[in-house]
Amino acid sequence: MAHAPQIKIPATYIRGGTSKGVFFRLQDLPERAQVPGPARDALLLRVIGSPDPYAKQIDGMGGATSSTSKTVILSQSAKPDHDVDYLFGQVAIDKAFVDWSGNCGNLSAAVGSFAISSGLVEPSRIPRNGVATVRIWQVNIGKTIIAHVPITEGEVQETGDFELDGVTFPAAEVQLEFLDPAADEGEGGGAMFPTGNLVDDLEVPGVGTFKATLINAGIPTIFVNATDIGYAGTELQDAINGDAQALTRFEAIRAHGAVRMGLIEHVDQAAGRQHTPKVAFVAPPSTYTASSGKAVEAADIDLLVRALSMGKLHHAMMGTAAVAIGTAAAIPGTLVNLAAGGGERSAVRFGHPSGTLRVGAQASQVDGEWTVTKAIMSRSARVLMEGWVRVPGDSF
């Protein structure tokens, strides 16, 4: 029996924030994969090495965690006043499934630099030295992201002294602005607060009823108080990810929260929407030891946040969830805001398993409705490898 030979596709492997993924230009994909559909999904699954019953992604580029099982497709933007269209695919590890329902905030930090380096940004918009402003249209959620990319001698400056908890080595700082991050009316769960409330009573059969802030900003997120579900907010990955019953409870919270947010109609549909919504728990500041062994002092943070992604506690914090945290913290009365001490806030520094992160948001109330014009945070990005990725020619 003859076997199809491997084909090679231009690709770049990039770390963005505390995640990494395989980046493609749309024009470089095989023709069948240049349009959404089964062929594209099958190709990306094979590139990453999924589905893998061993959950290791040994036969692909994935790293067997939600932070490293990611793909990005970029193209010159068809949107006026934008430079690049950015499409993100979260690849399941043990299932044949690519989730297109949300963005990756961490990889957003790498979009601007990749767009510049791969010729997707007009040369006239790139200074010889200074900072390039890349206008990104995030296709998954229909929102604008502005990336401020440092440039030296006409090239992207990746090295620097900006340190990011969850990333071992320093790099150049990339500031990101997430414009109008809240959901638009009628889109995926409605407005910023889909239920119309800052805090709801969320009933989860078999788990309990507890207070929850259901917010759609950056990414749909369900925030609950750590103490209401038996946690302190200082937990590291092993405390959650090694507890199968805990993960089942969190998935139940996520599924019932998704129904309340209007993202799905029935809880059993949550399995087909793994990337969104996220579920997170918050607590007031407390001293703890991060996964690196570094002490995080209560006096250095405004609150504690732990968040789950793709069914596991995240090793640091998803960038889009950080947008949700910053947005919710800026609005008095949400659980996030109350955990941070309440009142009006333009920025918070929160503690996560790997350390701390500062995120800001500009919020205002108009006719009784809260709006957020932008959320701001800094990340870094670095190309790890570039060239081609190879897959069997009959795999998609």
Describe the role of every protein-language-model region.
Residues 1-396:
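A glycine-rich beta-to-alpha transition motif near the start of alpha/beta enzyme domains, typified by
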